[in-house]
């Protein structure tokens, strides 16, 4: 699950880099056509390529209510809601900040690409530390703090360099959480992983929708910087909620185990 979460973070980061050049060539309608084609391709791969595995033993699944109300899973579900709500809201404003700082839209990839690549290198030591020292909880809390710092930094960012620095801090925390949280859901859910991950992914989608709506409304009514203030407040609430989470063994994000 750590690999799944990491791939989601990577795909989002890649979209930031390639969206503007693609838009210049084929326009917005072309981007939607590519997305539709990728969706069809994903369905074909799922149907024809992925093997159908039959369970050898019938495992009794916990009820949806039981999974939803499990305290550790509730913390993670609240976390993924906040993570993606603040993410979408933030990226309604960041492109405008870069334009105001003097960087045209078609050149934004020059900021996103190095920031994204460097963030993946910087997150690696934290993952290794969490695995070896069995300190995943501390790594997760640190990642939330990094997001909070980034949101606060955006409020005062008025140059391309300061915006890029805030983005780097943000992506280190974001990539850590995208890798950690799905694997933690799998560990806490135990025999009800399917149900728990279904609730988790649904909460993530609701967060994306809520962030877009709330972020757009705040931009129109209160100004761009209010979006970052809202994000910082939500992340502070998440930090308080996550603080009481119990520790897990480092193998929760054991990439070698996951890939095998």
Show where each model-derived region lies:
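C-terminal transmembrane helical hairpin of 12-TM major facilitator-type secondary transporters
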Residues: 137-181
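Juxtamembrane intracellular "pre-TM" segments in multi-pass secondary transporters
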Residues: 50-79
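Helix-to-loop junctions at the C-terminal end of transmembrane segments
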Residues: 122-135, 219
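A membrane-interface helix-boundary motif in multi-pass transporters
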Residues: 24-36, 217-235
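C-terminal membrane-cytosol helix-exit motif in multi-pass small-molecule transporters
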Residues: 36-55, 241-246
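Short amphipathic helix-loop junctions that connect adjacent transmembrane helices
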Residues: 92-107
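Helix-loop-helix hairpin linking two adjacent transmembrane segments in secondary transporters
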Residues: 4-47
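A late C-terminal transmembrane helix in Major Facilitator Superfamily
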Residues: 192-221
């Amino acid at each position: 699950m750590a690999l799944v979460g990491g791939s989601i973070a990577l795909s989002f980061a890649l979209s930031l880099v390639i969206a503007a050049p693609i838009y210049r060539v084929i326009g917005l309608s072309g981007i939607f056509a590519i997305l539709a084609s990728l969706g069809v391709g994903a369905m074909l791969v799922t149907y024809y390529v992925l093997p159908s595995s039959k369970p050898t033993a019938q495992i009794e699944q916990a009820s949806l209510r039981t999974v939803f109300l499990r305290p550790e899973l509730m913390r993670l579900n609240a976390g993924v809601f906040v993570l993606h709500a603040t993410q979408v809201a933030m990226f309604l404003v960041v492109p405008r900040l870069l334009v105001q700082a003097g960087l045209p839209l078609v050149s934004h990839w020059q900021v996103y690409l190095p920031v994204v690549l460097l963030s993946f290198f910087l997150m690696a030591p934290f993952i290794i530390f969490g695995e070896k020292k069995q300190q995943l909880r501390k790594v997760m809390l640190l990642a939330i703090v990094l997001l909070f710092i980034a949101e606060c930094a955006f409020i005062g960012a008025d140059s391309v360099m300061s915006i890029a620095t805030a983005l780097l801090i943000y992506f280190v925390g974001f990539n850590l959480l995208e890798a950690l949280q799905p694997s933690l859901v799998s560990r806490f859910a135990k025999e009800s992983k399917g149900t728990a991950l279904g609730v988790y992914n649904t909460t993530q989608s609701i967060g994306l929708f809520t962030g877009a709506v709330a972020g757009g409304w705040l931009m129109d009514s209160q100004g761009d910087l209010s979006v970052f203030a809202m994000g910082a407040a939500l992340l502070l609430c998440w930090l308080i909620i996550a603080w009481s989470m119990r520790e897990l063994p480092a193998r929760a994000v054991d990439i070698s185990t996951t890939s095998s």
